[in-house]
From Swiss-Prot:
Its main location: nucleus. Residues 105-169, 301-366 bind DNA. It comes from Arabidopsis thaliana (Mouse-ear cress). Residues 429-462, 476-487 have a biased composition (Basic and acidic residues). Coiled coil: none annotated. The modification Phosphoserine is found at S76. This is WRKY transcription factor 1. It is found in: Nucleus.
């Protein structure tokens, strides 16, 4: 029995040592500013070996010693220190997905109402206290502070650096560990219904991006958000703050005002688009009448281009079914002008040109453009174009040809009336003709000299033609004098 008692005592000592090691590991993992040595008193249990006791009494004695040993372990200073840490810091045990099931205890530093994050500690020479360094957890806040704690965990000295550029957080806010941004944090609230802030922000962003996500219910002016599922975000933040429905409405209205009046459309207006059952988009009659401003002009001309006062640029042409004439497409050459036109000739009347205008000009007619009337005859247009294209040489040649026609006409008159006139009247008429011819030739020479050009060959030809015409007239004047003598 003595040997059995020694074996049981040794087993109990091994179990007790394992339990104390586990407690030491838990204390080592805490985020405390200082490490306090823990003295663990181990009570040695002595099992009296009684040769006279029975096995049943020994079995009763062994559980009693084990229970007493566990009570001693629980009542040790280590177990008293653990609840003290939880009371002073009020930490939240958050389970990290990256570190498995190892507990992470965060120290609560909320005495001044702000959230702080510890980023270092050190032992100062000549100071018995451990100095800890903290910075504010608010983004871009430069406030810092230093704490000095005693061995018992009491704050001895606090020094602040910088000022906070933000208001104090709410009393129920949860301090988030910035080093564990990828972890999933949940707020512990008293019976409040938690909502996903990521989904709320997603909905508000969708409303500001496209107002189509806001729909009006029939018979009321209450605006409701379309139920859209936000993308699943790993590690989304859940908070216990639930905004009322009125706040959501004001956020929607403000976001629509920020985007401007152009993006905010009234989808109940008559000019809005309406969707058919088949899915095709149909424009309302109001919008169709405003956009379809067409003007059709009929012009009787043989030319395919009509001058309407504006400048056009051709950008296409195609054949029309049932018509042998193609259709040409033009757009106004003025920058930014939306006017277009297409021109085609009528298949029933070849002289009829049909011009269809689309849109309105947003500018004045360019200067130097003359509008031709639709009822103007093509012959008149041709005459004007011919007069504009005349040159000095062509005008002189035309005057010479006119003179030749006049001379031929006078010759015919003299031949027909020569027998009725007397012999004395013949020479008088011939002299008058000569004088008229000379005057016209002199006038033509003066005109040609005034409008002379480097090309001298044409002037020489005109003079040669004039000399020949004068020679022929003189030879013809001599013939009538001999004819009466022979008769």
């Amino acid at each position: 029995m003595a040997e059995v008692g020694k074996v049981l005592a040794s087993d109990m000592e091994l179990d007790h040592s394992n339990e104390t090691k586990a407690v030491d590991d838990v204390v080592a993992t805490t985020d405390k500013a200082e490490v306090i040595p823990v003295a663990v008193t181990r009570t040695e249990t002595v099992v009296e070996s009684l040769e006279s006791t029975d096995c049943k009494e020994l079995e009763k004695l062994v559980p009693h010693t084990v229970a007493s040993q566990s009570e001693v372990d629980v009542a040790s200073p280590v177990s008293e220190k653990a609840p003290k840490v939880s009371e002073s810091s009020g930490a939240l045990s958050l389970q990290s997905g990256s570190e498995g099931n190892s507990p992470f205890i965060r120290e609560k530093v909320m005495e001044d109402g702000y959230n702080w994050r510890k980023y270092g500690q050190k032992l100062v020479k000549g100071n018995e206290f451990v100095r800890s360094y903290y910075r504010c957890t608010h983004p871009n806040c430069k406030a810092k502070k230093q704490l000095e704690r005693s061995a018992g965990g009491q704050v001895v000295d606090t020094v602040y650096f910088g000022e906070h550029d933000h208001p104090k957080p709410l009393a129920g806010a949860v301090p988030i560990n910035q080093d564990k941004r990828s972890d999933v944090f949940t707020a512990v609230s008293k019976g409040e219904q938690r909502i996903d802030i990521v989904s709320l922000i997603y909905k508000l962003c969708i409303v500001s991006y496209d107002i189509m996500f806001v729909e009006k219910t029939s018979g009321s002016s209450v605006q409701t958000l379309r139920q859209t599922e936000p993308p699943k975000i790993h590690g989304g933040l859940h908070v216990s703050v639930i905004p009322p429905a009125d706040d959501v409405k004001t956020d929607i209205s403000q976001s629509s005002r920020i985007t401007g009046d152009n993006t905010h459309k009234d989808y109940n207006s008559p000019t809005a688009k309406r969707r058919k059952k088949g899915g095709n988009i149909e424009l309302s009659p109001v919008e169709r009448s405003t956009n379809d401003s067409r003007i059709v002009v009929h012009t009787q001309t043989l030319f395919d281009i009509v001058n309407d006062g504006y400048r056009w640029r051709k950008y296409g042409q195609k054949s029309v079914k049932g018509s042998p004439y193609p259709r040409s497409y033009y757009r106004c050459s003025s920058p930014g002008c939306p006017v277009k036109k297409h021109v085609e000739r009528s298949s029933h009347d070849t002289k009829l040109l049909i011009t269809t205008y689309e849109g309105k000009h947003d500018h004045d007619m360019p200067p130097g453009r003359v509008v031709t009337h639709n009822n103007m005859l093509d012959s008149e247009v041709d005459d004007k174009e011919g007069d504009a294209n005349k040159t000095p040489q062509s005008s002189t040649l035309q005057s010479i040809t006119k003179d030749q026609h006049v001379e031929d006409h006078l010759r015919k008159k003299t031949k027909t009336n020569g027998f009725e006139k007397s012999l004395d009247q013949g020479p008088v008429l011939d002299e008058k003709l000569k004088e008229e011819i000379k005057e016209r030739s002199d006038a033509n020479k003066d005109h040609a000299a005034n409008h002379a050009k480097p090309e001298a060959k044409s002037d020489d030809k005109t003079t040669v033609c004039q000399e020949k015409a004068v020679g022929t007239l003189e030879s013809e004047e001599q013939k009538p004098k001999t004819e009466p003598a022979q008769s």
